[in-house]
């Protein structure tokens, strides 16, 4: 059994990271899940949420937006729409997006076409704020 996982994360715009890591935690569509070296092969979907990985005693966080995770032979491939490290999140902009989404949701009902889009925007903003607020590694 390998001691490390090879983690690769890709968005349509760029390769976000390639790292040798000790473990990951991801926001699966059916709930949060973790992967350690020697994990059973897996293909699953991700939802908007906080993705983290550990290297030694350091933990790194990213805000991710919908995608897929494939685990095979101590390799974890993550394909997501967007991924932002905590260092790249503009906290003021995320808070402004949260305020806009909250205000717009107060004006809408679940029957409105825009309602679910605004709920998704609210969730993305909340995750970005959470990740940015981590205040550095680990």
Swiss-Prot record:
Fetch the Pfam families from UniProt: ATP-synt_DE (PF00401), ATP-synt_DE_N (PF02823)
Q: Which InterPro entries match?
A: ATP_synth_F1_dsu/esu (IPR001469), ATP_synth_F1_dsu/esu_N (IPR020546), ATP_synth_F1_esu_C (IPR020547), ATPsynth_dsu/esu_N (IPR036771)
User: What is this entry's stated membrane topology?
Assistant: Peripheral membrane protein
Tell me the keywords, alphabetical order. Answer: ATP synthesis, Cell inner membrane, Cell membrane, CF(1), Hydrogen ion transport, Ion transport, Membrane, Transport
The GO molecular function terms of this record are: ATP binding; proton-transporting ATP synthase activity, rotational mechanism
Classify the main location: membrane
Cellular component terms (Gene Ontology): plasma membrane; proton-transporting ATP synthase complex
The record's subcellular location field reads:
Cell inner membrane
Function of the molecule: Produces ATP from ADP in the presence of a proton gradient across the membrane.
Q: This protein is called what?
A: ATP synthase epsilon chain 1
Q: Which gene encodes it?
A: atpC1
